[in-house]
A protein has these predicted regions:
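Mature, structured domains enriched in cysteine- and short glycine motifs
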Residues: 302-352
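Amphipathic alpha-helical interface elements
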Residues: 1-303
Length: 352
């Protein structure tokens, strides 16, 4: 079959195409600026599907859909993607430190000792770069650098402990290395990362939970790093844990579920807070999207818009730090409006 040609289109031509497809554009100049900034493919092609139908073999927008609505969904996902990246970097640092502690406590702090082949399990790997020989070569190769902190430890102590070496290694390499730990070390690491008694998960099941979680986190980290659509992503990596709640979760809610099981809660809290903020922002402007996003994200969306008020003031603020207010009082937006308070002109605007 002959491939369809891809044609270049100017911003003006992109605008005309969107209008022909029925998308409502209230501010042409604003729409042009956003397309120039983010790109048609990133903004429109990646986020139009919930808002389009096929009519007479043509893709058209459903009645009433605006450019700003598509843009808002894009912004939701962009901010969610950034939050995923931040949370995964935080988790990465924690996991590397925990893994290094397990290795150092068992095999010492000298790489000549802790990077011995016999200390790990040589599993057959589909990808050669994640085999034990390849990973050990990569770890040993990272020792040969003139960059700190590895160079500093090599020169001053003649050895680089694992908690320093792991800093310079990709998270995916570390996770695949953990997968090659001996069962005793894997369990010790899992018990460091989880409260096994509170979860009532022990032994091999706890190790499987840890490994599955780490591989799912790698997938989301890589997705976020390469600008992939995040809010409706379905992981290729699978969770083997058998429990009733696991049967009901998928996609982004699964990531939150797994992060919430860890002892270290900051990655979960940061990501959950970002999701709630973005859903509140988007759904307060486009409540018709609540059902769709609730189903995709597998969450119960309850609109909540907090605002802040200074004592003896008749204005409410979306930004609690606006105008240097001290000891702000938090209210629901609806309550502030019922009390006759007025929005601050500085911080109360459409928060794209």
């Amino acid at each position: 079959m002959k491939n369809e040609r891809i044609f270049y289109a100017t911003i003006d031509e992109q605008i005309e195409k969107l209008k022909r497809q029925g998308l409502i554009i209230d501010d042409i100049d604003f729409a042009k600026a956003q397309l120039e900034l983010y790109g048609y493919s990133n903004l429109i092609k990646s986020y139009r599907d919930p808002y389009t139908i096929i009519s007479e073999d043509q893709k058209v927008y459903r009645s009433g859909i605006t450019f700003n609505q598509v843009l808002s969904l894009y912004i939701l996902d962009k901010n969610l993607r950034n939050a995923v990246m931040a949370s995964m970097l935080d988790l990465e640092e924690h996991v590397k430190e925990a893994a290094a502690d397990i290795i150092a406590s068992k095999y010492g702090t000298n790489p000549n000792d802790y990077l011995q082949f016999r200390n790990y399990v040589n599993k057959k790997k589909r990808k050669q770069r994640f085999s034990l020989p390849a990973i050990l070569d990569k770890l040993k190769g990272a020792l040969n650098t003139d960059k700190d902190p590895i160079a500093h430890y090599s020169q001053k102590y003649g050895a680089v402990p694992p908690w320093i070496l792991f800093k310079s290694i990709y998270f995916s390499t570390i996770v695949n290395f953990i997968n090659l730990f001996k069962p005793e070390e894997q369990l010790a690491l899992a018990e460091k990362l989880y409260d096994a008694d509170a979860l009532n998960i022990h032994g091999n099941s706890l190790v499987s939970l840890m490994l599955d979680t780490l591989f799912i986190c790698i997938e989301y980290r890589n997705l976020a790093a390469h600008g992939g659509r995040t809010y409706n992503h379905e992981c290729k990596s699978r969770l083997r844990l058998s429990m009733e709640s696991n049967n009901r979760i998928h996609g982004f809610s699964q990531l939150l579920f797994l992060l919430n099981m860890l002892k270290y809660q900051l990655p979960f809290k940061h990501l959950s807070k970002s999701l709630n903020h973005q859903l509140n922002r988007h759904c307060s402007m486009y409540p018709e999207d609540i059902t769709y996003l609730g189903q995709i994200l597998n969450v119960n969306i309850v609109q909540r818009t907090p605002v802040w008020v200074a004592s003896k003031s008749n204005r409410y603020h979306m930004d609690r730090h606006c105008c240097g207010i001290k000891n702000p009082i938090e209210l629901e937006l609806a309550d502030a409006q019922k009390q006759g308070l007025h929005p601050c002109k500085k911080c109360c605007h459409e928060d794209f």
